[in-house]
Amino acid sequence: MKHLHRLAALLALAATSAFAGPPYLTDDPVPTDTGHWEIYAFAAGEGHGSTLDADAGLDLNYGASPGVQLTATVPLSFAHEPHQGWQSGTGDLELAVKYRFFEEHELGISAAAFPRLILPTAAHAPREHTRMLLPLWAEKDFSGGTSLFGGGGYMINPGRENRDFWQAGVAVTQDVSKRLSLGAEVTRQGSDTDGGTAQTRAGLGSSVQLSDHYALLFSGGPTWADHRTGYHFYAALSLVY
């Protein structure tokens, strides 16, 4: 299903980090603190009209060493299309390593690589090939609780009628209080199939800190693809310990 190809690319953008990343598609270079876990119970997807492609599952992140984060995303996939009804099954397993290779505290600037493997484990949209995303992410923190982060990378997308493509995003967040952060982002992705079109997404997001360990995260907005307007969304409960 072409829509599921697009959803997988969307979820690959939505990586995991304590200070940005979720709920945004755009990631940041901040890894999980060494010896700590960040776990996200999430639901994410996109659609248009009565068509919906969504994943629900766990994002598991561990701070393996200073500047290094190990990530595994384990989803269940759901899809609905007119005349076909609902389908569900295991999603594509994702494995990634984030490596922060630059950090300047005084300037508030950092950068990281976050290569990601997307394994062909989905039950209702089986693939024969493993995909790989090769992104770079950077961030600038300002006084007053404002952060600007973004970057992008190249998706190696083998398979019949598939195309490799570039994708990029930029986001800005503002700490409104100690427990509330708001943000906005724009992302762009090239065509992932022969004869397909590029995709642009805009979104608003928020993070509500419930306690020292738990937070609620939300984002969503319009998606422009295939000469029509759809929508995308992300919601999660995060646990950091």
Positions of PLM-derived features:
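Cleavable N-terminal export/targeting peptides
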Residues: 1-25
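Transmembrane beta-barrel domains of Gram-negative outer membranes and organellar outer membranes
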Residues: 19-241
